[in-house]
Each structure stands twice: as structure tokens, then as C-alpha cells.
């Protein structure tokens, strides 16, 4: 009886959550709480830098993270010609939409940092990342004052036929000095397993 009652209560709770999630008032409360969370986080952490390490502390192996071989026709064609035809496309709420090649990105001011990657899967590794600060590229595109977030579309597929993986970050994180569009890991061009041709490091 206890199990059945608990199951029924859980069903009611979930049903209530579903109704709440469709309520404009409840959505407003959640949005306010989300905004407050961001403000408190920024107040406590600010623009603090992540710890940087020495070359002697580099991990001997830097595992693949995510899809280690995006096996799509488009990606394979780009990989076969060394990503010469690949472009970083920037659009949306910007004054200047951009299509930047790897050569153009490499011509921008570079930053190198030795930082630790802490994966949600429970492993970590220290790597030397080189690339262009994301803020530098965003400044070229001139985001609109209305822009608050950026959405990044990746070569990784979520699941067969489900489309590409994407992620988003706010502009505060995008402009953090250590947020990097990395094209090299440990002084070598990014390998496919590490996100070639370009990986965002936040």
C-alpha cells in the first residue's frame, strides 16, 4: 500500500509540475530565480581565472571527450582536405555576420593556457591549449545590445538522426579571458578526437 500510495503521489507531483511548467506566472518566477542565481554567481566568482599549470604537469594522455570521430559525409570531406574549406560561422544578433577560416582565426591574437579539463564523466586531464579568445572574435562580429547568450553547434551528433549537438553560454562567460576557441592542444593541431578543427574551452 505504501508503494502504491507513493507512486500515486509521485504521479500527482509530476502532473502538477507539468501544469506548473505551462503557467506564465510560474515561468516568470523561474526566470527571476535564474537571473538571481546568475547575479549571485557573478558577485561571488566574478571574472576569476582558473588555475594554470606548468608544462611539467601536462597529462601524458588527453582523452577524447564527446564524439571521438564524427562520421558524417560533411565532416569527412572537411577532414580529408585538412579543414581548408571549414568555416566558423557567426550570425544571429550581430552587426557583422562572419565566416572565418582556420587561417583567419590563427592570424588573430593568440592565447596559450595550461588548464585542467574536469569531465562530468569523472576524469580530468591537464592540457596546453592555444587559440583565439572568444571575446576577440565576438568583438569582430559586434553583438547586438539585446544579445545575452551564444549557441554553439557542433559536429557531434546527439544520436543517429537526431541532429547535431549544441550548447549555450552567456556573454559573460563568452568574454571571460580564458574562454578560448582552441585550434591546438599540446603544441599540435587539434586531433579529431579532441574536437578538430576548433574546440571551445570555457
Kindly give the residue locations of the regions a language model identified:
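N-terminal export signals
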Residues: 1-20
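Structured, non-membrane catalytic/scaffold regions adjacent to prosthetic-group chemistry
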Residues: 20-202
Amino acid at each position: 500500500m505504501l508503494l502504491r500510495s507513493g507512486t500515486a503521489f509521485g504521479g500527482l507531483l509530476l502532473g502538477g509540475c507539468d501544469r506548473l511548467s505551462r503557467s506564465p506566472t510560474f515561468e516568470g518566477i523561474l526566470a527571476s530565480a535564474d537571473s538571481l542565481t546568475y547575479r549571485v554567481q557573478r558577485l561571488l566568482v566574478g571574472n576569476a581565472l582558473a588555475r594554470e599549470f606548468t608544462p611539467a604537469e601536462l597529462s601524458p594522455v588527453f582523452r577524447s571527450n564527446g564524439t571521438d570521430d564524427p562520421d558524417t559525409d560533411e565532416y569527412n570531406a572537411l577532414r580529408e582536405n585538412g579543414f581548408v574549406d571549414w568555416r566558423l560561422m557567426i550570425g544571429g544578433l550581430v552587426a557583422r555576420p562572419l565566416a572565418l577560416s582556420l587561417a583567419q582565426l590563427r592570424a588573430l591574437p593568440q592565447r596559450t593556457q595550461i588548464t585542467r579539463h574536469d569531465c562530468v564523466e569523472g576524469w580530468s586531464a591537464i592540457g596546453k591549449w592555444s587559440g583565439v579568445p572568444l571575446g576577440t572574435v565576438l568583438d569582430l562580429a559586434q553583438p547586438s545590445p539585446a544579445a545575452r547568450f551564444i549557441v554553439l553547434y557542433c559536429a557531434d551528433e546527439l544520436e543517429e538522426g537526431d541532429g547535431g549537438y549544441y550548447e549555450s553560454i552567456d556573454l559573460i562567460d563568452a568574454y571571460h579571458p580564458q574562454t578560448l576557441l582552441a585550434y591546438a592542444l599540446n603544441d599540435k593541431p587539434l586531433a579529431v578526437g579532441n574536437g578538430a578543427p576548433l574546440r571551445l574551452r570555457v
